[in-house]
Amino acid sequence: GLYSTAARGKVWSVLKKLKVAVLFGGASSEHEVSRMSATSVLNNLDTEKYDVLPVGITKDGRWYLYSGPVEDLCSGAWERHSGNVPAAICPGSGLVAFENGVCRSLPVDVVFPVLHGKNGEDGTIQGLLELAGLPYVGCGVLGSAVCMDKIIANRVMDATGIPRCEWDCMERWQRPELAAIARRAAEKLGWPIFVKPANAGSSVGISKARDM
């Protein structure tokens, strides 16, 4: 290449580090999975290139700027860290922290949402970040919302001719007809059948049914 490893290091040393806010946790059934993913991300982000701001979201939706050890994420001990500072993402202000009665804006170049499931992968966080004018990693609002709902995603694929596996569904309002719908699905798909919630993450609530 043009530069030796040492030369590249010198180039990075004089460039401004990118400020990355990493969101983890979330008000979701996949809160624990997010904490594990964020642990991996935080352990592997190159701190010579990036200034990292971990932002944890509790299961009940409280946001905190977190400065404690990364290893406390998986256990959930991060929530009890004495240095946690209440935070939020606000349209017009970006990422803000509330400390000692003062609201201060934190400069952020990009947000990395390491969130899983509802309120993380379904377009909600993405919409908030767009309203706040913050660039972010991952799919946009529409792609996130469509792909989070497996029924909508399958219907979009059907309408556009994208190949996919055979499927069937039951809407919430059809619950009284569960037995009839299950028989229809068995006739259409054959056994075994994999059953899962339409709008949860890929690993949540899935089961393998071999008979009625």
Model-derived segments and spans:
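ATP-binding N-terminal substructure of ATP-dependent carboxylate-amine bond-forming enzymes
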Residues: L2-L142, V146-I152, V156-A159, E171-R183
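Residue-level signal for beta-strand positions within conserved beta-sheet cores that form or flank
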Residues: K16, E48-Y50, P163, W191, ...
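Glycine-rich phosphate-binding loop of ATP-grasp-fold ATP-dependent ligases
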Residues: S34, C165-C169, P192-M212
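Acidic/histidine-enriched active-site and ligand-binding environments that engage anionic O-linkages
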Residues: A182-F194
